Amino acid sequence: MSGRLGELLVRENLISVQQLRKAQEEQQKNGTRIGTALVKTGAIEESKLTDFLSKQYGVPAINLKDFDVEPDIIKLVPKEVAEKHLVVPVNRAGPSLIVAMCDPSNIFAVDDLKFLTGYNIETVVASEVSIREAIERYYAEKGPSLEDIVGDVGDDIEVTKEETENIDEMAKAADDAPVVKLVNLILMDAIKKRASDIHVEPYEKDFRVRFRIDGVMYEVMRPPMKLRNAITSRLKIMASLDISERRLPQDGRIKIKMGGGKEMDFRVSVCPTLFGEKVVMRLLDKSNLQLDMTKLGFDAQPLAWFKEAIDRPYGMVLVTGPTGSGKTTTLYSALSSLNGLDTNICTAEDPVEFNFAGINQVQMHDDIGLNFAAALRSFLRQDPDIIMIGEIRDFETAEIGVKAALTGHLVLSTLHTNDAPGTVSRLLNMGIEPFLVTASLNLILAQRLARRLCPACKKPAENVDEQALIDAGVPPDKIGTFTMYEKVGCRDCNDRGYRGRVAIYEVMPFWDGLKELVINGASAAELKQEAIRLGMSSLRMSGLRKMMDGATTLEEVVGNTAPDRF
């Protein structure tokens, strides 16, 4: 609600538009919250603002100046957490901890407090000014640190020279119960918040943990520098990596079992940086893997084209897009629909993200010479019906894949290109002859992922910029025939306004008209123009349809797709 607070106060005639603008200038100048800026500029009294917030959030309001919080209560919340989330614990009530917050809708803060304290969290609202004053007052002498929560792991763990490191001590610290508890907290919190990646990042004077949620990075924690090596070592031990090797990148995998028997995999990448090892973990939740093609977000005609292309006994189907655009999900859904007792499927992947019964999956190992090209050559002696190559990276892999597609095999793979027509140019630039490209390709699919508007709180847009719609590519005659929605923010979406992502597809069957253009040396722009004439919807066109259907916003479409220019 923070972004709309000023507008709500104006609407309730508690402040004027001029006062809001003055406060916004103060906010931009000093980086404070809008509520604090309004109080500082004299637009509204602190007590009136707190009462207003209480009504908006539906929670009681308190004046922290009237409270004398017991030290035992203060110790429950580390100073770092109090300052990060602007919270102050005020009392206990049975299994619940009552916490004063200036933004009770901050689900991240509530979750962190619940994890760290073990209490159910009941929120009350207080102004930011009073919370900052309370933090300064209660934590002035010696506030509790996060180390008090996770325990002391020993001063000798932090070292300055690699040659003096004690590996036995590092391993021991990594297995200490407090460190194990903190690492488990990070992993479980990422699962609960539906993160796709966890970043554990060391810097010269700082150490932070960030989650990527719906494609956007969010900071969630700043553990003490003292625990940096212990946390990294714990993650490396869980991933069966060598904790004594800190100069080279390492890759591994973590598998954990949660309540109810559910298992979760984490793909782990460790990379040495200037101030220590950075750990990135990709969450691999097979239960959330969508393998039903009809539920991936295809429109009816593109879905029919895609199904027809993968149902052919031979030829090549390519899925393109940047990292994190959902290519693996699309390929896995295709393999799932093709997997049967009468089919031999071989895949070369780097890495293998999910295991599938009935599919022969091979993990690449470049260090011993097992790359995509080597795996492909081996597959051709394995009597395959369908071959999936994780990525076409070079001429050798492309050449073998094309030849396999021309000799009775269905080949599925990915490339990193901006759109479907651009994939043809990439293959030609790799050195594949035009006649081989036209003879082997069945279909090219380009895709992106845009954030989906939260269905629980999205609302019709009050002000629609018609010129912005036209500039984005919406036909003028379509303006006013659909309802545009805008993000709001609620507990369901952690006050972000978005929840999950929606796929945007550009499906280009390799029609005869396109083959003729390729043979004649046409450019990617000419290919795209002809494909659209033949019925293809570009990424921008598909994205705008998702917007007109109310699934996402114009900002997401424009940010994830390029305009169609010929």
UniProtKB/Swiss-Prot annotation:
The gene is pilB. GO terms for biological process: pilus assembly. The ATP-binding site is essential for assembly of pili. It comes from the Bacteria. Homohexamer. Interacts with PilC. Interacts with PilM. This is Type IV pilus assembly ATPase PilB. It is found in: Cytoplasm. ATP binds at G321, P322, T323, G324, S325, G326, K327, T328. ATPase component of the type IV pilus (T4P) that plays a role in surface and host cell adhesion, colonization, biofilm maturation, virulence, and twitching, a form of surface-associated motility facilitated by cycles of extension, adhesion, and retraction of T4P fibers. Acts as a molecular motor to provide the energy that is required for biogenesis of the pilus and the extrusion of substrates generated in the cytoplasm. PilB ATPase activity is also essential for T4P extension while antagonist PilT ATPase activity is required for T4P retraction. Belongs to the GSP E family.
